[in-house]
């Protein structure tokens, strides 16, 4: 990577936000494909931490150590984000970053607006349903994605069972985890308590 990168210790709270897809123009700008629709973080943080992932076919090879680049300018361009990084001054230098994962410190994210949440904060939250009048565990949020209209929670089904110290994962007859896709919209989500790692909804339990 370029000598413009800062090689200090990476923050412990790095969150992967996208991947550098290509160079953009001839003045060293890069184009990033965000992992989610919440690309505003890429535009607002002052530094990106770039990591070159290990080749999937290479055994024993690990990803590179994250290095920080100062973000001089960044803007949305279609479904991507284009940015100018300090020390990256021409297309060749930008192309050398192709494929790098783009991360940022969670502590550097701007505060979300009321009733808005960063997707990364929803992962790991327990989702409960009161569709039948009683609050019951549906499962734990494993992933959040955009279906083009709104965010969707991918929930790994779990159930509280007598005699068990914690929730028990539910599986199908072949032993595969049961999943539920729950729209993350006001019509179904009643309350989000990030401190308690809990989301309450009226999504029906469908055993």
UniProtKB/Swiss-Prot annotation:
GO terms for biological process: ribosomal small subunit biogenesis; rRNA processing. This is Ribosome maturation factor RimM. Residues 114-207 form the PRC barrel domain. Its main location: cytoplasm. The PRC barrel domain binds ribosomal protein uS19. Signal peptide: none annotated. Keywords: Chaperone, Cytoplasm, Ribosome biogenesis, rRNA processing. It comes from Bordetella parapertussis (strain 12822 / ATCC BAA-587 / NCTC 13253). The lineage of its organism: Bacteria, Pseudomonadati, Pseudomonadota, Betaproteobacteria, Burkholderiales.
């Amino acid at each position: 990577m370029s000598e413009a990168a800062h090689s200090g210790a990476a923050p412990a709270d790095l969150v992967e936000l996208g991947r550098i897809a290509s160079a953009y123009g001839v003045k060293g700008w890069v184009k990033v494909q965000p992992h989610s629709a919440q690309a505003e973080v890429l535009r607002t943080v002052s530094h990106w931490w770039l990591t070159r992932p290990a080749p999937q076919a290479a055994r024993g090879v690990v990803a590179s150590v994250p290095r920080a680049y100062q973000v001089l300018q960044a803007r949305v361009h279609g479904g991507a984000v284009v940015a100018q990084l300090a020390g990256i001054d021409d297309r060749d230098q930008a192309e050398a970053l192709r494929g790098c994962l783009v991360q940022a410190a969670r502590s550097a994210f701007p505060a979300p607006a009321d009733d808005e949440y960063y997707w990364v904060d929803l992962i790991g939250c327990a989702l409960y349903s009161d569709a039948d009048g009683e609050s019951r565990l549906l499962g734990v949020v494993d992933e959040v994605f955009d279906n083009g209209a709104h965010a969707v929670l991918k929930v790994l089904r779990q159930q509280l069972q007598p005699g068990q110290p914690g929730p028990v994962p539910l599986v199908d007859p072949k032993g595969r985890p049961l999943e539920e896709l729950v729209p993350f919209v006001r019509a179904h989500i009643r309350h989000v308590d990030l401190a308690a790692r809990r989301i309450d909804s009226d999504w029906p339990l469908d055993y």
